[in-house]
């Protein structure tokens, strides 16, 4: 059985609807947007042709999810009529925030769309256009870990920030757990490019939840209909209650 608070409700638009999930990099590349240079451009592999093999399939080196085929937000917007024909009323986007990996579960910047996908303004327009056509946008909330190549950890030094990896005096240092600083730390299922966060660290909870400056309200003000919470089973109840 499911236990929930009596006042808990779900959005009316979500009930009985059809959800369509999109992995942006491989959905559609529109010529109306040209991918901008990323902070970690040097480690990304841009593909000019949509049907090219991933670089790791050519080199046979250890796979890294850094092949980019440059699917973008404009490509999604151009398929509005396709979604309407399918009676879709909700689109769930895999992570869109800046990340060095094509899956974008290794967040580098929680407040900006990845420059290969588009801009924050592009995303705001997408949300508004789709909502006006009866389709809500849900974002993937990746809050159990960040990327090591990020503003917050900055292991590769691609950002101007003092990340947790760079100094114990970093404002982000309390977010992470180091066994031996700086190279041995807790990471999501042992993937060292995904350092896990201390989910009940007050500064981190404020970063995510603060009504004025937090990650959640930032994207909600851009027009999303809701969130899908990644690995929700790995969060303490106190964090979930605060969302």
Question: Can you name each region flagged by the protein language model?
Answer:
Residues 16-23:
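Mature N-terminal segment immediately following signal peptide/propeptide cleavage
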Residues 1-12:
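Extended acidic/polar, glycine-enriched regions
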Residues 24-89, 96-222, 243:
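Substrate-binding/active-site clefts of carbohydrate-active enzymes
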Residues 11, 15-16, 32-35:
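Short, charged, solvent-exposed linker or helix-capping segments at domain edges/interfaces
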Residues 116-119, 232-240:
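Acidic-and-aromatic substrate-binding clefts and catalytic sites of carbohydrate-active enzymes
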């Amino acid at each position: 059985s499911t236990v929930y608070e009596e006042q808990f409700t779900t959005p009316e638009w979500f009930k009985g609807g059809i959800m369509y999930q999109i992995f942006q990099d491989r959905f559609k590349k529109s010529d109306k947007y040209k991918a901008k240079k990323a902070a970690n451009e040097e480690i990304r592999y841009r593909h000019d042709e949509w049907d090219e093999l991933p670089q790791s399939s050519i080199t046979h080196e250890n796979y890294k999810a850094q092949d980019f085929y440059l699917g973008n937000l404009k490509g999604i917007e151009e398929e509005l009529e396709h979604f309407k024909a399918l009676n879709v009323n909700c689109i769930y986007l895999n992570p869109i925030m800046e990340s060095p990996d094509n899956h974008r579960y290794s967040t580098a910047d929680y407040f900006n769309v990845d420059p290969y996908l588009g801009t924050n303004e592009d995303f705001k327009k997408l949300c508004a256009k789709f909502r006006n056509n009866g389709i809500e946008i849900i974002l993937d909330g990746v809050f159990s870990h960040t990327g090591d190549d990020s503003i917050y950890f900055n292991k590769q030094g691609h950002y101007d920030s003092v990340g947790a990896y760079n100094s114990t005096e970093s404002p982000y240092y309390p977010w992470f757990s180091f066994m031996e600083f700086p190279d041995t730390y807790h990471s999501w299922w042992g993937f060292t490019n995904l350092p896990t966060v201390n989910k009940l660290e007050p500064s981190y909870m404020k970063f995510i939840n603060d009504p004025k400056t937090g990650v959640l309200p930032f994207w909600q003000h851009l027009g999303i209909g809701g969130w899908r919470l990644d690995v929700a089973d790995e969060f303490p109840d106190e964090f979930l209650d605060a969302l």
